[in-house]
């Protein structure tokens, strides 16, 4: 199975890619390697995936909000699944740089939906965030809990994607 993993250099993306490779899948990883946190750690994760996978791991450093770059990198490649973990993270930073969140978390998400639609990808999994529950004080959160009062732009973008 060939799986596209966005956010492949992040902690969850890296762990997922390792697991998929361990079971024999082919993984195409995408990440923009932004400097929201330590880029060297992200590069180490990509190097580890390459070292452990033979030729079953391919990595593209790109911003999936750029549809031309996304389509170009995946031209001629058939995808069986998409696991969309990539996003501009951080609640506080969303107040300082809202355009980054609109581009990555909204436009980028639409690009991945369109990619899946045009390529007839059978399944796409999206990772949202507990931030969508806003100021909810009930713990643990439940799927039935209200998510209509986001407290940050980050939360609003994640909720919009749901």
Where are these regions (language model features)?
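N-terminal Rossmann-like NAD(P)+-binding domain of SDR-like oxidoreductases, especially those catalyzing
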Residues: 1-162
């Amino acid at each position: 199975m060939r799986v596209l993993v966005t956010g492949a250099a992040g902690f969850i993306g890296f762990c997922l890619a390792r697991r998929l490779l361990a079971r024999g899948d082919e993984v195409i990883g995408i990440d923009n390697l932004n400097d929201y946190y330590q880029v060297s750690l992200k590069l180490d994760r990509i190097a580890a995936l390459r070292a452990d996978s033979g030729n079953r791991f391919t990595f593209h450093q790109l911003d999936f909000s750029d549809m031309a770059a996304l389509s170009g990198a995946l031209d001629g490649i058939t995808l069986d699944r998409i696991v969309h973990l990539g996003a501009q993270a951080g609640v506080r930073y969303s107040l300082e740089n809202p355009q980054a969140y609109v581009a990555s978390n909204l436009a980028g998400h639409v690009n991945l939906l369109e990619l899946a639609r045009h390529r007839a990808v059978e399944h796409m999994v999206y990772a949202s965030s507990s931030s969508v529950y806003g100021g909810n004080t009930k713990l643990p959160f439940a799927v039935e809990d209200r998510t209509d009062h986001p407290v940050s732009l980050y939360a609003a973008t994640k909720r919009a994607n749901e």
